[in-house]
Amino acid sequence: MKFSGKALVLFCLASLGACSRQEPATPPASSAPPAAVQPAPTPPAADKAPVELSPELVARLERPHSPVLGAAKGRVTVVEVLDPACEACRAYAPVVEQLLFLYPEDVRVVVRFADFHPPSQEAIRLLEASRQQGKFHQVLEALFERQSEWASHSAPDASRAWKIASDAGVDVAKARKAANADGVSKMLALESEDLVALKVERTPTFFVNGKLLVDFGPKQLFALVKEEAGKTAQ
């Protein structure tokens, strides 16, 4: 994916937020007594504060096999739990890229996997095999860009993901062998164990410097990253 700076993140924030922004319907004039006193509107609920994890859970956020994007030694670690077949994860990909663009020296993004959709496990195996060839980021981007080709709701077909990986430069014969190795099966089991311990039930889920982002939204993610970056700069 190619992104174009600050204009892109404004577009992403607006488009993602629009999905949850609903105006209350205006009732017909006859639905309320003419003299009824209308109650004051309920103020919007305040954002829920991020939840700081225990040291035991923080230790589960990152594993030696976890792919890392951005600054390898960044002061702010964003852990994203994603499902490559998840449409919301695809929608958040430009948001994550924008974080890396805005904080090139400070932010490192650690990727963890969930297989909540039928074709996801094979795609995760493919991504791990691609990581071993140094092609993780390229393949993840390609799988998101062409998600409808292999992860449609009506006819999911993970085998098509291999063609997408090949187009991204992966040696597919080598990757197929690596994807079916015992080590990858153990990796998938550990991913599942960690997600259960961390109580991850949706994708994407974000943790920033050991804090769970409770409220789901790009605005909240950017705010928490900015806050943590400010702390580490002091």
Language-model features and meaning:
Residues 76, 87-90, 117-121, 130-134, ...:
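Soluble non-cytosolic domains of exported or imported proteins
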Residues 102-165:
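Structural microenvironment flanking redox-active thiols in thiol-disulfide oxidoreductases
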Residues 1-17:
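Sec-dependent bacterial lipoprotein signal peptides
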Residues 75-77, 104-108, 133-138, 170-172, ...:
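Loop/turn elements at helix/coil->beta-strand transitions in domains of secreted/extracellular proteins
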Residues 13, 80-83, 200:
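Processing junctions and N-termini across compartments
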Residues 2-3, 20-34, 162-234:
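C-terminal cap of thioredoxin/glutaredoxin-like
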Residues 2, 19-118, 191-192, 230-234:
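Extracytoplasmic thiol/disulfide redox context detector
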Residues 84-87, 114-119, 145-150, 181-184, ...:
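Solvent-exposed loop/turn segments at secondary-structure junctions
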